[in-house]
């Protein structure tokens, strides 16, 4: 029996995933959490074979949870299931230790296929993402400007470009307004930009926001 832990802040999503998984012999959702902090407690107290992890959550975001899991339980496969398109986060989460990446629009059959593959020790990416990864390896010298940003800076960039204020971002990430403002300044410096409008135009042009 494949034991699955589902981490998502939306109850309707968790219920949908439980239904999909329960319809497949040999696997079941045995634990769930609604935010990042709860996720770490649940995973430590209720061992599982694979984690389905959302990225955008309150208290502790998915990327931070992923990094902590990879550090503390490197053999536990984490399959990121996100509303964000592959272009936005897939490469970063794979570098951070994820075993695979799927968007929430993916067909249920692909989700089940991905779960079985990562539990066996494999990696799951879509053909499109696999092609992008190969292309990136062949063109390291021509990286996009935003690829020099740290994961946190990249996250703040995407949130600003989505129309969120520094105060809103601080609340969602559980950080101080001063800290988010510092990240904003670093982003502007690294991308050689002057204001939020330029960051937003850039993010839209590069497909970093929907």
Mark where each language-model region is.
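Short amphipathic alpha-helix used as the core "switch/output" element in two-component signaling
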Residues: 41, 63-75
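Acidic catalytic/metal-coordinating carboxylates
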Residues: 35-38, 59-64
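Short, flexible helix-to-coil linker/hinge segments that flank and couple to helix-turn-helix
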Residues: 88-95, 100-155, 208-209
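Helix-turn-helix DNA-binding segment
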Residues: 143-178
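The feature encodes the CheY-like receiver
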Residues: 13, 58
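Recognition helix of helix-turn-helix DNA-binding domains
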Residues: 165-198
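Acidic, metal-coordinating helix/loop segments flanking the phosphotransfer/catalytic sites
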Residues: 32-50
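Active-site residues of response regulator receiver
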Residues: 54, 82
